[in-house]
């Protein structure tokens, strides 16, 4: 099946996403667009020289005209986070970049599904929804899908259990106000606290889980990686690839991605991550999972923090 995917931004994240796409079967055509023509041509040259080891695929360094009629568009453009910066620190600069990109790509690919990866991703998703004219159902922010993966990795390591058996999630902003709704955490249907009791009795683990330390690991991992190597891109690319897989599958999936809220948990007019139904038609809606009173308060606080930043921006 012919499927065109456009990646806007050929920085570390965009180039790695394009490379990951070139290894799979989600796309038959990949267009990579970047303001730095020499950089994008170099990235594409590096990618295409490895495509002889797979079934034929088209990968080009293009412009917005080449992105016409894309099935999926991934936006990664923006200034990258530096060590010690929060994602919110990037807001106005990257908002200005998004305001420039959105009308250009929307004009040539009005029917595409859009995956927003640029940080701060919840704000960038909101801005794209407000300035592009694209229906909200076609717009998905990568949100906390990576945070959820980091959480599951940490729990997998702690309990020596495959990540696919862990059902635990990160909600809220992809950033400092995110939280873990522990009331939802299970391992193969067993509440996490009960599973941990069993693991302690069997000496699989000796230390009890510290919820605050676990949340700190999830929230600070990105910053630690940036401090050590300058940027994060492998796990980000893997998480985006997971989203793309859901968008081309025969059935819908549920993932913690960012999309516009319309009264869920009492939250309006902000993009934030809760369990969201996504599939070939984009966003179908939010799964109305019951949260505790404290968890609902944390979600609303996260939404309010994002709204406060949005109110200060020139959108």
Predicted regions and their residues:
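Extreme N-terminal starter segment of soluble prokaryotic enzymes
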Residues: 2-5
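N-terminal Rossmann-fold NAD(P) dinucleotide-binding loop
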Residues: 14-15
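Conserved S-adenosyl-L-methionine
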Residues: 23-28, 133-135
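Conserved N-terminal Rossmann-fold NAD(P) cofactor-binding segment
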Residues: 29, 33-71, 85, 307-315
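C-terminal substrate-binding/catalytic lobe of Rossmann-fold NAD(P)-dependent dehydrogenases
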Residues: 134-138, 148-315
């Amino acid at each position: 099946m012919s499927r065109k995917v456009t990646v806007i931004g050929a920085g570390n994240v965009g180039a790695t996403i394009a490379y990951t796409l070139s290894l799979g079967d989600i796309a038959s055509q990949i267009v990579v667009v970047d303001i730095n023509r020499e950089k994008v041509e170099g990235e594409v040259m590096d990618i295409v020289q490895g495509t002889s080891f797979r079934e034929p695929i088209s990968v080009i360094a293009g412009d917005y005209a080449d992105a016409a009629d894309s099935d999926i568009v991934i936006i990664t453009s923006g200034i990258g986070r530096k060590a010690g910066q929060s994602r919110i620190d990037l807001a106005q600069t990257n908002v200005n970049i998004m305001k420039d990109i959105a009308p250009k790509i929307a004009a040539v690919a009005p029917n595409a599904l859009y995956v927003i990866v640029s940080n701060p991703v919840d704000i960038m998703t909101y801005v794209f929804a407000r300035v592009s004219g694209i229906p909200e159902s076609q717009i998905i922010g990568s949100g906390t899908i990576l945070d959820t993966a980091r959480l599951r990795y940490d729990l997998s390591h702690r309990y020596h259990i495959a990540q696919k058996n862990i059902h635990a999630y990160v909600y809220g902003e992809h950033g400092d106000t995110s939280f873990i709704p522990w009331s939802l955490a299970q391992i193969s249907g067993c509440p996490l606290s009960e599973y941990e009791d069993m693991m302690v009795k069997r000496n699989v683990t000796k230390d009890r889980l510290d919820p605050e330390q676990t949340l700190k690991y999830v929230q600070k991992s990105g910053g630690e990686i940036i401090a050590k190597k300058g940027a994060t891109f492998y796990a980000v690319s893997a998480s985006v690839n997971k989203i793309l897989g859901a968008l081309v599958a025969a059935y819908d999936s549920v993932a913690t991605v960012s999309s516009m809220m319309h009264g869920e948990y009492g939250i309006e007019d902000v993009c934030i991550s809760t369990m969201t139904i996504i599939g070939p038609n984009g966003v179908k809606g939010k799964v109305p999972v019951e949260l505790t009173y404290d968890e609902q308060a944390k979600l609303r606080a996260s939404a309010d923090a994002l709204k406060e930043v949005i109110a200060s921006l020139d959108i």
